[in-house]
């Protein structure tokens, strides 16, 4: 398949959700794999680390006609590009998380609520830069308005903390493929 690196990362991410669901052990199928929102993104986001690991990329990142493995120089550039703009991305997620929480502490939604004004007030109240808007705007923020993340969108940022620690445990073994350690 001809996937971009972003698409490959998404594939690994969604595969992490699938593995979590498949290997979750519970008495009832419909509830097995259900965990607190704080944890739900950990299995998927830890899988993203494997997508970006040079050792793993050499297994899947090959030319579709020749089978030539991705050059080490290109892997290095991909690693560097993953760090570029990290502060911007974190603020985007943080802004969306704060917006999500502020929507869910409203006692009632005013009939004349101006979503853009509400967003601006949330960002100003928290001292966030208006140049870096929330990752998702109110008008299409599906996670918080119906995607099951009500007041829990912060779990993506929290999962980054957890998944970095979890993946580091694999790296500390000296072999990220070792199933025994």
What is the role of each PLM region?
Residues 1-181:
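Cation-handling catalytic/transport regions enriched in His/Asp/Glu
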């Amino acid at each position: 398949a001809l996937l971009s690196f972003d698409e490959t990362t998404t594939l690994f991410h969604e595969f992490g959700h699938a593995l979590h669901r498949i290997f979750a052990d519970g008495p009832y199928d419909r509830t097995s794999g259900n965990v607190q929102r704080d944890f739900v993104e950990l299995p998927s986001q830890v899988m993203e680390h494997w997508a970006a690991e040079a050792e793993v990329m050499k297994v899947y990142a090959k030319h579709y006609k020749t089978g030539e493995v991705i050059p080490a120089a290109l892997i290095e550039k991909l690693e560097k590009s993953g760090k570029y703009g990290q502060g911007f991305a974190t603020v985007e997620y943080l802004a969306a998380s704060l917006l999500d929480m502020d929507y869910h502490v409203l006692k009632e939604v005013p009939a004349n609520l101006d979503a853009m004004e509400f967003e601006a007030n949330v960002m100003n109240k928290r001292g966030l830069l208006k140049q870096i808007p929330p990752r998702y705007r109110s008008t299409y923020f599906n996670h918080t308005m119906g995607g099951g993340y009500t007041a829990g969108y912060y779990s993506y940022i929290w999962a980054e903390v957890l998944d970095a620690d979890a993946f580091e445990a694999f790296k500390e073994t000296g072999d990220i493929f070792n199933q025994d350690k």
